Amino acid sequence: RDVVKKPDGTLAWQPKAINNPEQMLSIAQHISKPTNEVCMRCHVGSGGGMNFKRGDIETAHAGADRDFDVHMGSNMQCIQCHKFKDHQVVGAGTQMSGKDLPEARGQCENCHKGRLHAKAENDRHGKRVYCTTCHITVFAQHDRTDMRRDWSQAEAVAGEGRFEPKIEFQKDVKPVYTWWNGTGEIALLNEAVRVGPNGKVGMYVPNGSRKDPKARIYAFKYHTAKLPIDTTTGMLIPIQVGPVFKTGKI
């Protein structure tokens, strides 16, 4: 990609081949299903750096063995579980309020069916406790993950000539657990924020309870941040990360 200046003076990324019809044709003629390597080019570094965002998709997954990740260590491909239909993906992360295919969900049970445990008691637990709650006890085992961002403070990044918000990292993080039915409440920019019982604003709050028959106990990465709020409207103030990276100020 190249950085180009738009008519209004702002800068934007532009594919190198956009003004090269022959190269664009070649790209169009060499489309194939994405491999793990292709998926990881974006998802490993989402959120600003390696393993920053989710904490469970790390650089080490590229050459993982079965002890590190039983699926990728068995040479499975991402798209075997994260399936697509007409370029729409099945399922969504817990931080997403919208879904391409709301009626379809990616679940462990899509492959793992029938009696799965030596003890029937464990299978009964599976009706209310999701698989990853027990089978993935920690995350960020290789690369540290972003657990808190303070946008009121900016720190210079050594050797890069830019700033970024103050970030607290952790490794070998134990998830937090709560009931979830697959839906949640998300904070929107055009609505006043809602302060929860813990005194904090929930950017995404999972829906579900013990009394909800559709809910199970899931493991979550609990990320916190310090964000600006308009004291008059009670709304979140959108952050333009470009100026923050350049000046260290919101």
Named regions from a protein language model:
Residues 1-250:
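C-type cytochrome heme-c attachment and multiheme electron-transfer modules
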